[in-house]
């Protein structure tokens, strides 16, 4: 079974990689820099501020905004962990997506004018790119350019790691020794533990509900658990309690916590920080959110605290800074040779420090890809039988392709005696680039969560969290019935909460038509004046709807008149073009920069007091595109706490031939405050 599974995934990953590279290459060779920026694939108007040494052969290039153009970096869709190219603004965009380095004209001393690296840190005022130290000479030449730009490219490292993992899975000979792998390849039946089941006597968090306690007790007593956490059900709090209870039961327990993205694991890291002794918690990789609580656990930062390591690093940084001032190419070359010798010494000392930090920790937090990092796996080179981990926890498992989830299982084979998966298979699936092969799409969209419940139809290992602490009951009702078999309950503390209950809101309690008292509003945009438009500036002509934008603006201004805070409002649209147009109006023209505007993907895992959802699609053919994706809409409609405002054409949803959309729009006609706007009132 392991060979069949690996073979299926290897062919699917190969196809997905090819599609990804072709798509990215086509975009980079056909679109201008400005178009790439508009589509979130590039960042321009930046310059080099600093270069410094990083961890184990890394070089950090720190880039800031060009203040003559803007005081903030327009980040687009580029995020921590992305592979990017950094180039001077005069370099042409025309490129293949493989990380290559180009020569520029002889007046630049023949040096190369392109660097490839990984986005290590990001903020509105600085981007840090981690480069291999072999690019040091090239990187230094960028000081002489006033403008640089960044291009997002295909992350081939990710595909390489998944393929390598699948090959290793196929090579495991029978009989398989690893009990967890036996479950996952359907070579071992799952029988829940009933003989030695021990309930936890005392929970540390007094606010846990019964479903959370049941999930924790089950996970403590069984070697395979899926914690199914719908929106707002406190999945992360459940995991935090589980981790603490594992350490209480066995203080020597070693836990690896993984997730598909930096943000997914940083959320757990932030919550664990005040509850676990600092020396027991270690973060490997690139923290996406640069909170002090995350920094203090970063392997990079902790290893730099070693005095000798610190001294050598400072000496290297000093020489790098000197190189900025050297005009003579020969002198610069000599300087780099000295830096290389220092780096060799630094690398040896860093490995020793890193090994000590990993061994003293009890909880290691990293992404799924980071779980096979050389820092962790180097411990097995010294001692193949070294017991590094006991428990593996994968959070947001439904956002990861299954081959990603195998990376820690194969990298640390025969280590884990317990696997806990947490997530919600009714929210966004992993992002798949393939569009031309249904088998590949099915293979890669079917998550480990989905496949396990298919292998074990009794679902004995699935523990459902049934109380949500986010949404007003009326907002929760349709998602609960359509996606969770009506099992979701609204906690009493949130069931009836409204915008009027916010301390800043100064609405009049006696006025019934006040928007702050209504949890669910739908602006029905039927009619020719609310037709969608294809935006030619965006990839594949993404759609936008000017009439809907006008309604969104009016509703925001109405909420602001009641003093609903800007940062309590979020605007979501499935379409990039609509998001772009909304940002231009609300952020640039109205200067309401604290209102968050994003696609559905950008809001997963987030929440706001009020969400305005702009559906965009309004056409005579009743085409709905993205809106057919139930899980995408489920995410959008479960983000708000106190008010959900939908702006969209009800007739299109009811006549598009999609049962889910028809059911939703009909339910809203009965349960929402439906309004029929006249475009003349908004112009």
UniProtKB/Swiss-Prot annotation:
Induction: By heat shock.
Subcellular location(s) per record: Cytoplasm; Nucleus
Its EC number(s): 3.6.4.12
Binding site for ATP: 229-236
GO CC terms: cytoplasm; DNA helicase A complex; nuclear replisome
GO biological process: postreplication repair
Similarity remark: Belongs to the DNA2/NAM7 helicase family.
Additional record remark: Present with 1040 molecules/cell in log phase SD medium.
Protein's name in the database: DNA polymerase alpha-associated DNA helicase A
Organism: Saccharomyces cerevisiae (strain ATCC 204508 / S288c)
Upper lineage: Eukaryota, Fungi, Dikarya, Ascomycota, Saccharomycotina
Gene: HCS1
């Amino acid at each position: 079974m392991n060979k069949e599974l690996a073979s299926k995934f290897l062919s699917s990953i190969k196809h997905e990689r090819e599609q990804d590279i072709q798509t990215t290459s086509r975009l980079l060779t056909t679109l201008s820099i400005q178009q790439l920026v508009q589509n979130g694939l590039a960042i321009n108007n930046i310059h080099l501020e600093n270069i410094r040494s990083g961890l184990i052969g890394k070089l950090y290039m720190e880039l800031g905004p060009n203040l003559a153009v803007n005081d903030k970096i327009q980040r687009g869709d580029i995020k921590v962990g992305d592979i990017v190219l950094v180039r001077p603004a005069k370099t042409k965009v025309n490129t293949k997506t493989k990380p290559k380095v180009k020569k520029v004209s002889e007046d630049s001393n023949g040096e190369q004018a392109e660097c490839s690296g990984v986005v290590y840190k990001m903020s509105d005022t600085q981007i840090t790119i981690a480069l291999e130290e072999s690019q040091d000479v090239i990187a230094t030449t960028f000081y002489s350019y006033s403008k640089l730009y960044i291009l997002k490219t295909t992350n081939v490292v990710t595909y390489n790691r998944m393929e390598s993992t699948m090959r290793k899975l196929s090579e495991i000979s029978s009989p398989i020794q690893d009990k967890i792998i036996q479950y996952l390849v359907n070579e071992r039946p799952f029988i829940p533990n009933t003989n030695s089941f021990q309930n936890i006597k005392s929970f540390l968090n007094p606010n846990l509900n019964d479903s959370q306690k049941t999930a924790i007790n089950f996970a403590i007593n069984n070697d395979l658990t899926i914690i199914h956490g719908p929106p707002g059900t406190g999945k992360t709090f459940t995991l935090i309690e589980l981790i603490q209870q594992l350490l209480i039961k066995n203080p020597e327990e070693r836990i690896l916590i993984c997730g598909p993205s930096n943000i997914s694991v940083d959320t757990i890291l932030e919550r664990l920080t005040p509850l676990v002794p600092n020396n027991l918690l270690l973060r490997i990789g690139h923290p996406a959110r640069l909170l002090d609580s995350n920094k203090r656990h970063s392997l990079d930062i902790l290893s730099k605290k070693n005095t000798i390591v610190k001294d050598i690093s400072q000496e290297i940084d000093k020489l790098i800074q000197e190189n900025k001032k050297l005009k003579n190419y020969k002198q610069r070359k000599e300087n780099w040779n000295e830096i290389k010798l220092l780096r060799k010494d630094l690398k040896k000392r860093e490995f020793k420090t890193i090994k000590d930090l990993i061994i003293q920790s009890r909880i290691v937090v990293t992404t799924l890809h980071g779980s096979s990092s050389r820092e962790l796996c180097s411990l097995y080179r010294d001692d193949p039988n070294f017991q590094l981990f006991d428990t593996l926890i994968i959070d947001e498992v439904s956002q990861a392709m299954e081959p990603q989830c195998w990376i820690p299982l194969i990298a640390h084979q025969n280590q884990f005696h317990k696997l806990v998966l947490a997530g919600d298979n009714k929210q966004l699936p992993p992002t798949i680039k393939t569009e031309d092969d249904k088998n590949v799409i099915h293979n890669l969209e079917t998550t480990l969560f989905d496949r396990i419940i298919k292998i074990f139809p009794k679902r004995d290992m699935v523990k459902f969290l049934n109380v949500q602490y986010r949404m007003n009951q009326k907002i929760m009702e349709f998602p609960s019935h359509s996606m969770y078999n009506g099992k979701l309950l609204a906690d009493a503390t949130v069931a009836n909460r409204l915008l009027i209950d916010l301390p800043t809101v100064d609405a009049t309690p006696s006025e019934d038509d006040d928007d702050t008292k209504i949890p669910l509003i739908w602006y029905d945009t039927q009619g020719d004046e609310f037709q969608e438009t294809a935006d030619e500036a965006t990839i594949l002509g993404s759609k936008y709807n000017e009439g809907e934008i006008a309604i969104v603006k009016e509703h925001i201004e109405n909420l602001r008149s009641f003093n609903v805070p800007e940062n309590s409002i979020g605007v979501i649209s499935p379409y990039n073009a609509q998001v772009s147009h909304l940002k231009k109006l609300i952020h640039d023209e109205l200067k309401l920069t604290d209102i968050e505007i994003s696609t559905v993907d950008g809001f997963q895992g987030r929440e706001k007091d009020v969400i305005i959802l702009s559906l965009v699609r309004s056409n005579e053919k009743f085409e709905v595109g993205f809106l057919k994706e139930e899980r995408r809409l489920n995410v959008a409609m479960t983000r708000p706490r106190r008010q959900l405002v939908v702006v969209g054409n009800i007739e299109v949803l009811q006549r598009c031939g999609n049962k889910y959309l028809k059911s939703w729009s009909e339910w809203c006609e009965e349960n929402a405050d439906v309004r029929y706007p006249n475009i003349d009132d908004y112009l």
